[in-house]
UniProtKB/Swiss-Prot annotation:
Natural source organism: Chlorobaculum parvum (strain DSM 263 / NCIMB 8327)
Assembly and oligomerization: Homodimer.
Domain of life: Bacteria
PANTHER family cross-referenced by the UniProt entry: GLUTAMINE-DEPENDENT NAD(+) SYNTHETASE, NH 3 /GLUTAMINE-DEPENDENT NAD + SYNTHETASE
Pathway info: Cofactor biosynthesis; NAD(+) biosynthesis; NAD(+) from deamido-NAD(+) (ammonia route): step 1/1
Name this polypeptide is given: NH(3)-dependent NAD(+) synthetase
Binding positions for ATP per the UniProt entry: 36-43, 138, 167, 189
Enzyme Commission number(s) of this protein: 6.3.1.5
GO molecular function, a single term: NAD+ synthase activity
Reaction(s) catalysed (UniProt annotation): deamido-NAD(+) + NH4(+) + ATP = AMP + diphosphate + NAD(+) + H(+)
Length: 277
């Protein structure tokens, strides 16, 4: 498999995602959105698409730093705010997170990172209720498939326009949309603690895992065929385990079916398919 197999017609992607955002938001009876703007590439792309879809006045970005957040992240988030002319508010989560861990001083980095992510989502949904806007998601396909995110934290949203785009495809779309190179070229990081890096956490690069995921998902290749492409057995086994183990993160809560029409199984509300006026 060659790297270019992951390449998309990004003009076509843009032409799909812009009306997708507008139509889905309006289906739910909303006109505006709120999203977390971290200074990373994923939220920058979603912000760019939302502004083009709904207009800058209908997009609110929340900057939600913790005390260890890098200055660069805040600068890059502000760069997108200034570029697009969208509305923005800064809501630090330091007080909430530190108060939570006052009685849990031995909590691991993982637990602290999860609480940071959920504290940010708390801010987003509170603003959603305050302003009557819908929360846009910023999790990409690579993160969703690997379970590299916090359930009911950064993975929570009402509409996610980039959930079917691999991380490497997000970089391509970002270049197409004209996102500043400072955001595209920097090392991916959730900025949960000083020096944190996505690829260091995962133990492999996004380019490597996207190639493997593409073969597993889009090409539906079996293990032996994938290994014949030069993928290391241990790498394949680890990634497959992550995909299988984290299936629950990609689902709404499982409901036991007891009636003829069950939410999430065979009950559909009219707005799920009706044409929007």
């Amino acid at each position: 498999m060659e790297p270019q197999d992951l390449h998309l017609d990004y003009g076509l992607v843009e032409s799909i995602l812009i009306p997708f955002i507008r139509n889905e938001i309006r289906k739910f009876g909303f006109r505006s959105v709120v999203l977390g703007l971290s200074g990373g590439i994923d939220s920058a792309v979603v912000c760019e698409l939302a502004a083009r879809s709904l207009g800058a006045d209908n997009v609110l970005a929340l900057l939600m730093p913790y005390k260890t957040s890098s200055r660069e992240s805040l600068e890059h988030a502000q760069l997108m705010v200034d570029r697009l002319g969208i509305r923005a508010e800064t809501m630090p989560v330091t007080g909430v997170v530190d108060a939570f861990f006052e009685t849990r001083p031995d909590a691991s980095r993982l637990r602290r990172g999860n609480v940071m992510a959920r504290s940010r989502m708390l801010c987003l949904y509170d603003v959603s209720a305050r302003d009557g806007c819908l929360v846009l998601g910023t999790s990409n396909k690579t993160e969703l498939m690997l379970g590299y995110g916090t359930m009911f934290g950064d993975m929570a949203s009402a509409v996610n326009p980039i959930g079917d785009l691999y991380k490497t495809q997000l970089w391509g779309l970002a270049r197409h949309l004209g996102v500043p190179s400072e955001l595209i070229d920097k090392q991916p990081s959730a900025d949960l603690w000083e020096g944190q890096s996505d690829e260091a956490d995962l133990g492999f690069s996004y380019e490597e895992v996207d190639q493997l995921l593409y073969m597993m998902l889009e090409e539906r290749m079996e293990r032996d065929a994938i290994l014949a492409e030069g993928i290391a057995p241990a790498f394949y086994d680890r990634v497959r385990q992550m995909v299988v183990r984290n299936q629950y993160k990609r689902m709404m809560p499982v409901i036991a079916k007891l009636s003829s029409r069950t939410p999430g199984i065979d009950f559909r509300y009219a707005r799920d398919w009706q044409e929007m006026k």
